Structure formats: C-alpha cells, structure tokens
C-alpha cells in the first residue's frame, strides 16, 4: 500500500469515528483511531515506544510510521528487537529503560510474552513465564540523546509491565515535553498518575489499560462525565480490582500445584 493510500485510509477512519467530547474512557479497539485523531492524521512527527514488542501486531507506533513519522523503539527481548530492526524504519535499542541509579547495570528479564517484565513478582491473569534473560539498563534520556531525538517529542508510549515509575525517573519531562504520553496503568493505585501530574501533566483519557497524559497547559479538557469516569476507575473501583487480582493470583498458584 503506497503512502497516499495509507493516509486516505487512516484519515477516513478518523472522520468516521470522531467522537463526542463527553466520554474519557474508551475500549482498546478505538485506540489507534483516537491517536490518529489526536494528531490530526499528521504526516510527520517523532514517536518513542518503550516496550515496543511486535513490529506491527498491537504496536502503538506502527500506524504513525506508516504515515511517515520517525522515532525510537526500545525492546529488551532480543528476538523481538531483531524483528523490529528488520521490519521497521525507526531506531531500535535492545535494552530496558530504568532509573538513573540503575543505568549501566545488567538485570534479569522475566520472559512471558507480552507480559515480560523486570519485576519477578509481576503477574497478570493468563501470563505464561518461559524463562529469563539478561538485559542492559539505560535511562530514556540516554537513549533519546544517543538517537538525537528532537525536543519537544510528539508521542511517547510506555508499556513496561510494572516498571513505569523507574522509566519516568529517567525521563526529563521538562526537556522532552511530549505532546502525548500513553502509559499502561492497571489502576491498582495512583502512583503513576501522581508522578505525572506533579510534573506538569494532566490525565485526559483512557483507552483499554492505557492512560493518556498531556501537558497541563494543553487546551484538551475533560467533561464532567469524563471526571466521573476517572473517579470511578481510579478511586471507587480500586478495592474491587485488588481483590479480583488477588483471587486470580491464588487461582493461578492453585492450578500450578
């Protein structure tokens, strides 16, 4: 498919699925459409994808690369990093992002497909551990400097299975000031939300399990319905979510014998 056809396809989807600005929480199948709408189908931009995983399937940045964007892909699983090098144009770093105090160290990566994590205690229902490997740790700042990334950035996706705060600690938000940060948040607590809001970002949307954050000065706003959705998700629903997850863990341990 040539570039003109790709642009027409995605812009058509954006127009077709433009949503009323009432809701703030949406199902995951609308994620790509809403991202493209956010950037108005722009043909140029710079993305950063931490925990890039598969080159295309479920990729947060593949649609942008199709439109002509440039960027950085960070993927600690060496087999996937090699596939990214073969199938994507963006710069690939086969490392894991962490905090400044961990930079330069080697860490154990607990392999479990899309749920691969640096945290040995990380668990979600359905994950299947398949072993471990060693990976080099670097801060996101170091990677961006090495890649000669522009500032401000346009889009940053963070999907690191429980290591989000450490990644953010190695990411100078004042320097890079991305227009949109999309970060996986299972909503068991407010630690990620508080970190970002204290550093000049505001929550504006959620798609699937990903929170959307934009600079506090952004004109994007949340409706009263959106605020209610946030309160229900991140406050009222937390105790029930924690209990449900504990039940899943116990069930998984019981099945493992």
Q: Where are the model-predicted features located?
A:
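Phosphate/nucleotide-binding beta-alpha loop and adjacent structural elements of enzyme active sites
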Residues: 1-257
């Amino acid at each position: 498919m040539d570039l003109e056809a790709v642009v027409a396809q995605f812009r058509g989807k954006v127009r077709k699925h433009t949503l009323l600005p009432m809701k703030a929480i949406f199902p995951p199948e609308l994620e790509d459409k809403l991202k493209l709408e956010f950037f108005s189908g722009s043909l140029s931009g710079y993305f950063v994808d931490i925990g890039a995983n598969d080159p295309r399937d479920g990729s947060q940045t593949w649609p942008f690369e199709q439109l002509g964007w440039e960027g950085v892909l960070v993927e600690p699983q060496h087999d996937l990093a090699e596939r990214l090098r073969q199938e994507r144009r963006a710069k690939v770093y086969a490392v894991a992002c962490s905090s400044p105090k961990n930079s330069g160290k080697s860490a154990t990566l607990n392999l479990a497909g899309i749920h691969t994590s640096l945290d040995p205690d990380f668990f979600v229902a359905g994950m299947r551990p398949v072993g471990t490997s060693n990976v080099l740790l670097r801060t996101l700042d170091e990677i961006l400097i090495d890649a000669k990334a522009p500032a401000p950035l346009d889009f940053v996706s963070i999907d690191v299975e429980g290591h989000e705060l450490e990644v953010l600690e190695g990411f100078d938000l004042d320097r890079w000031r991305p227009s949109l940060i999309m970060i996986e948040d299972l909503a068991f607590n407010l630690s990620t939300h508080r970190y970002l809001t204290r550093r000049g970002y505001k929550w504006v949307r959620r798609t699937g399990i990903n929170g959307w954050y934009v600079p506090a000065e952004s004109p994007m706003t949340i409706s009263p319905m959106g605020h209610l959705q946030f309160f229900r998700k991140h406050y009222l629903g937390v105790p029930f979510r924690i209990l449900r997850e504990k039940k899943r863990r116990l069930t998984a341990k019981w099945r493992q014998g």
